[in-house]
Amino acid sequence: MQRFGTGSSRSWCGRAGTATIAAVLLASGALTGLPPAYAISPPTIDPGALPPDGPPGPLAPMKQNAYCTEVGVLPGTDFQLQPKYMEMLNLNEAWQFGRGDGVKVAVIDTGVTPHPRLPRLIPGGDYVMAGGDGLSDCDAHGTLVASMIAAVPANGAVPLPSVPRRPVTIPTTETPPPPQTVTLSPVPPQTVTVIPAPPPEEGVPPGAPVPGPEPPPAPGPQPPAVDRGGGTVTVPSYSGGRKIAPIDNPRNPHPSAPSPALGPPPDAFSGIAPGVEIISIRQSSQAFGLKDPYTGDEDPQTAQKIDNVETMARAIVHAANMGASVINISDVMCMSARNVIDQRALGAAVHYAAVDKDAVIVAAAGDGSKKDCKQNPIFDPLQPDDPRAWNAVTTVVTPSWFHDYVLTVGAVDANGQPLSKMSIAGPWVSISAPGTDVVGLSPRDDGLINAIDGPDNSLLVPAGTSFSAAIVSGVAALVRAKFPELSAYQIINRLIHTARPPARGVDNQVGYGVVDPVAALTWDVPKGPAEPPKQLSAPLVVPQPPAPRDMVPIWVAAGGLAGALLIGGAVFGTATLMRRSRKQQ
């Protein structure tokens, strides 16, 4: 028995020692090849951090560092064919129930350039350049987003009104060319020398007319010279993985003047909710940066992110105060889960807009082509207690991760398949929408575009969650117009409960499914709670406790009672002793 006990003790000690060594190795990182996991929790809200709503403007002086983005049209494009995403969403049937009339949609993006097919465009302010009104789009992004939400159709019969459009700006780092001085010299006198005509050639009789030059060709239309244009087309998106195809299309260098028409040529493009008003707020631009980026203790990139978070918070508050009932944020920010910057102001802003101002906030899930936007895990079957994989998040997307107050949109193709390499997954993704085959209004003229200029004479095709969010914002506006009695949170509830769900019911790529405008407008869906669950980080303000009760009378009474008991006990004890003493005598 003793030997058996000793062996068992040694075996237990050996197992304990092995476990200890393994724990030390894991803690020290000696076992490599394990993916990093940053356990994060859903963000909380501090309402006291709400930023003020003053006149829009940048936090620090800004300047333009790059040329504005030019736009184009892919070869072989026929705008008379309806974009695939419009056919997928069955918008013609959805429009039987309304077009979003009376709803204000704020577009917090790179600005929106005025266009004849955006007749209800409202300037909302500029957080990029001081004194701006939000109606300049150097990046050719915000105009695309706004047009997918609210562009009116063109039937070719009604002329569209002309709108003023500002000229494209140029980088402020360039110095203007030096003034040129032109000196005119007098023309020297010319000497004319007359040369006698040569004698007639042999064989020509004297007095016969000398043959002149050949007559010019008869007047009339001539076939124009053909210029074969060359270049390349980049297919998937603005940046990231690219598939480049050559362009070889004949161009006429002398096109004939177009015949006058009543209106622009008809096309099949329209915004999701062509009856809404658009509030344009320019909050970001890749062409602009801080005039002096090397001030303060932070590195320039971190400082820019901090400023972007602050201006986004202020833009959300400003949009809500301007009466927007839908707020679209397609230009989101990504950051590592290891280094999440302070977002108390942004959290307070989305809470204020969604709860206090009853606005539906729609945000993009983020695109893998953008800086710091690394893909998150989708699902870990070994963690059944964490079905949305919060503990596996490596990239935080803001303001998208404020999922209780923001409807975050992932991207799918025209067949409903997730764009897994482009759309950033996350536990905050609630719904999805098409993000390909993008068509929109041009920020440079009165036409349509489906591409932007890229490097090396290439065209980049817009795609991604930015445009998926625009589609959902348009559908949210349709639902708000159809059900004005519903709160913002109830509108979100209706959208996600009428979406076309994935196989698991909900996942981190498409959320609860692909948005379905017709179902959202027609299905019988319970309203649900009017407000989202509260996730407050600041302590609640509780009423002051009542004044403490005056205990002096109680203690006096208790002391008197105790004294009486003592006296009574003494008297009783004395009487008992006297009785015993008498008995003994």
UniProtKB/Swiss-Prot annotation:
Q: Where is the composition biased (Low complexity)?
A: 163-173
- Transmembrane segments in this chain: where? 552-572
Membrane topology, from the record: Single-pass membrane protein
The active site consists of: 109, 141, 466
Where is the signal peptide, in residue numbers? Answer: 1-39
Cell location: Cell membrane
Give the highest taxon in the source lineage: Bacteria
Residues annotated as domain Peptidase S8: 83-521
What InterPro entries does its record include?
A: Peptidase_S8/S53_dom (IPR000209), Peptidase_S8/S53_dom_sf (IPR036852), Peptidase_S8_Asp-AS (IPR023827), Peptidase_S8_subtilisin-rel (IPR015500), T7SS_pept_S8A_mycosin (IPR023834)
Q: Where is this region: Disordered?
A: 163-269
Q: Name one GO biological process term.
A: protein processing
Q: Name one Pfam family in it.
A: Peptidase_S8
Could you state a single Gene Ontology molecular function term?
A: serine-type endopeptidase activity
Query: What are the alphabetically sorted keywords of the record?
Result: Cell membrane, Hydrolase, Membrane, Protease, Serine protease, Signal, Transmembrane, Transmembrane helix
What upregulates this protein?
A: Constitutively expressed during growth in culture.
Q: Which family does it belong to?
A: Belongs to the peptidase S8 family.
PANTHER family reported for this sequence: NEUROENDOCRINE CONVERTASE 1, PROPROTEIN CONVERTASE SUBTILISIN/KEXIN-RELATED
The protein in question is named: Mycosin-5
